[in-house]
């Protein structure tokens, strides 16, 4: 038989059941109504529902069939008008069989009879009683190496350890007791914590601030209305067709948990919801390929098979893992995820079930993580449908009453942040000081420019004085020996025109001089280099002083004698030569490199 897809809604007087039977015949439909039991049969479909309230067949019931869509709508009156049926959206729990059974199950739940009056339970205490530590024996250690929902599984990883290394952080879970798991987890978190990554997310606030402004769908539902009654909670939570299909596929079963294991199941649920709320916030509700990794990595229950004993330990463990593993490692995100979890629990077990179904779908699509559905998520999806709403509300109040600080996480975050701020202040002050040194006042630049102009004018004056003295000496020498003057003109032809052109070029270069802010050392080196070229090029030789009778020789003979005398000077014969006196202070206006044409004239 096939269990058909169905949906249930209610108003104050009637219960409406919509059943999808596309391949059924309208002539073969049977409906059975009695008390809290509803049965539907249309070959090949069969549906049996155990309702949370009583219905009655009094003639007001009716059924309609849409042959085009293959949908049957059954409207059944409530036995007590105005009664609210709780948990109609928890489809798996509605499929539970009741009444007499033809065969007894292998494991029977004691006290499941309808005639047994449910005892009123005391207020749930979320703090498990502490017991003194006793060194366990080897047999006791083997019995403690259990995991999964309610610690009901063991031996799963004995043959699959290599394949499941990427799923969980715990190695050899089948031989590692709970106390050793906690110790290894704390050591791994301490080794994984990266101060640089944490400080980068702390001071780069823009990405984190954007994530902090996001509101998950359940927070928006809480803000949309003030009422948190069971009826209001069910109206706010709706399941998709895919989620309803998944609920119908779950096998309905009862979990036999003692008080301690039941409390650990509730605490593990908080751990799962914290990891899920963080994932929804950082992805802004848009799941990606990293979603499965984020959820299982942030949950110590999934990654280390941790069994918590109090809510505070869960919050501390979650905060430590947020600062060690994901992309965004900020303490404000930890606080936001805790607040989101409180809001989710306030919305009721239907909202919790919806989130668990989303986790189940994420793991189902991730190849190595599907094993976590078998160990935890599937059982949580079935179990949460049967828990009492007041326990979920009590769990929400417990989480809301607690808070954690950075000092609780054990990473010395306060000292780390203070040291980072001091370093940041020092760097800021150093940058301000360097910028002040680089930006010189405008008045200083102007004064340096005026000093440069004055030094240039002084150099021009000294150069002109030197030229005057040189011209006077040459004039006196020409008067004393006019032949020597003619010889100098023959040796260095066109010297006067070259000096004149040099002065003109120097005047043009003066107009092209760079601003006063240029480096003075570079200009000085260039001046020295050009001066050496000028000294090597501009050398004026005078004729040697001889007897008086030699002065009436022709210029050609004088040139020959000069050549002979220069040859004798190379052999050691003393000769008197005079050079043009160069001013000891270099004048940049007279330093002009010789052209190739001038070099040829100087050689001839």
UniProtKB/Swiss-Prot annotation:
Keywords (A to Z) from UniProt: Cytoplasm, Nucleus
Regions of compositional bias (Acidic residues) in chain numbering: 458-484
Entry-linked Pfam families: SHQ1 (PF04925), SHQ1-like_CS (PF21413)
Predominant location: cytoplasm
Positions of the CS domain: 1-89
Extent of Low complexity compositional bias: 447-457
One GO CC annotation: cytosol
Record has Nucleus as a keyword: yes
UniProt-annotated location(s): Cytoplasm, Cytosol; Nucleus, Nucleoplasm
Spans traversing the lipid bilayer: none
Stretches with biased composition (Polar residues): 494-503, 563-574
GO biological process: box H/ACA snoRNP assembly; protein-RNA complex assembly
UniProt function note: Required for the quantitative accumulation of H/ACA ribonucleoproteins (RNPs).
Family the UniProt entry places it in: Belongs to the SHQ1 family.
PANTHER family with a match to the protein in the record: PROTEIN SHQ1 HOMOLOG
Record protein name field: Protein SHQ1 homolog
Species of provenance: Xenopus tropicalis
Gene: shq1
